[in-house]
Amino acid sequence: MKKIITTALIAGCILFVISYGGLYLGVKFFPGLFVAYDNPLFNSDGSRDVLFYLHAFIISFALSWFWDRFKVLFKGNFIMRGVEFGLVYSLIALLPVMWISFSSLDINLVMVLSWFLYGLAQAIIAGLVFAKVNP
């Protein structure tokens, strides 16, 4: 259990920094993509903002548990194991969520694809951390 918590905290910190930096760079270099977020669907009164920033840690704890349970199924060096882990998670969890989001919300395909790629990147990065720290 200690290994799950430790790797989750390490991955959470790394994902938080990368996510926050990626958001800043995304707005700076791809402002057109973020125009779609000027929509009542995405506006919040600010009372739940902390939940957004905790996302990196929530996903890291979930993925850390998943890694600890199924790590024996991923073969190869730590890079191959981390990438395969990210791909498996993306196909099992992200793809269905993106499908239902696109089909039920008033969002465009580019937005959904950016969410999928963001989630895939998070899962691969977390997988690399887990494969290195908790082989």
Language model segments and positions:
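Juxtamembrane/disordered regions of integral membrane proteins
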Residues: 1-135
